[in-house]
């Protein structure tokens, strides 16, 4: 068996996230189904992703790996996969890698983007969160506090099996492109729903639904199951995953 590393894009609007579910369509489920079809294999061919994106979340550079036996060249395998996948999921690159490679555990950085639209647009309803006009300077002051090694327990959905809730954030900034306000964040790892909690909380501060002091306390005094603000999934995009 050869181990393959793939990068893929998907529009998350019609997926119940990345991870296999007992019912409903997932990205992992679609990929495994297509691999079984191409190989005429009845047993499961597990696909492991770098980031387990939630329902409605998109990816421009998700990375995954799987073990597969085929006589097809890499180019032929991409064509076979994309020919059987639905149009909202595309394999962009494929390569054979070392048997020890792991898409999730070998990743050293992940880069996410969250898109907000200051206004109403039917075209962006599945790609951005519609918000009122905002102060970019204040937003970037809030974002800058996230850079560094912090415990993000307050900004995550708590799971007991997690060994720790610390993440190292290398980049955290907002940019403006016309009416599109985009949050860029790069870190070594991210907790469940973390980016959406961060965005929702920063917007809540801007809209005076939460004080700057309370935002700072959430970061400096981490606690689980805080009632906090969460941005909707459709604005979130996994941009790329970095390996050594």
State each model region's role.
Residues 1-244:
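Structured-RNA-binding interfaces characteristic of tRNA pseudouridine synthases
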């Amino acid at each position: 068996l050869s181990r393959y590393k793939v990068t893929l894009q998907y529009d998350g609007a019609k997926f119940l996230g990345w991870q296999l579910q007992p019912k409903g369509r997932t990205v992992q489920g679609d990929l495994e189904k297509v691999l079984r079809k191409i190989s005429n294999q009845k047993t499961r061919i597990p696909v492991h992703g770098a980031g387990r994106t939630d329902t409605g979340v998109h990816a421009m550079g998700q990375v995954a790996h799987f073990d597969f036996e085929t006589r097809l060249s890499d180019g032929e395998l991409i064509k076979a996969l994309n020919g059987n996948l639905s149009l909202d999921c595309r394999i962009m690159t494929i390569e054979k890698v070392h048997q020890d490679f792991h898409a999730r555990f070998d990743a050293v950085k992940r880069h996410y983007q969250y898109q907000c639209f200051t206004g109403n647009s039917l075209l962006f309803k599945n790609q951005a969160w519609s918000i009122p006009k905002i102060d970019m300077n204040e937003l970037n002051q809030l974002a800058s506090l996230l850079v560094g090694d912090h415990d993000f327990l307050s900004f995550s959905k708590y799971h007991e099996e997690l060994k720790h809730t610390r993440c190292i954030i290398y980049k955290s900034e907002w940019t403006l492109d016309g009416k599109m306000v985009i949050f860029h964040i790069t870190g070594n790892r991210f907790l469940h729903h973390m980016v959406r909690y961060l965005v929702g909380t920063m917007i809540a501060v801007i809209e005076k639904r939460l004080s700057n002091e309370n935002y700072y306390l959430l970061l400096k005094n981490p606690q689980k199951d805080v009632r906090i603000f969460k941005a909707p999934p459709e604005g979130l995009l996994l941009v790329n995953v970095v390996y050594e």
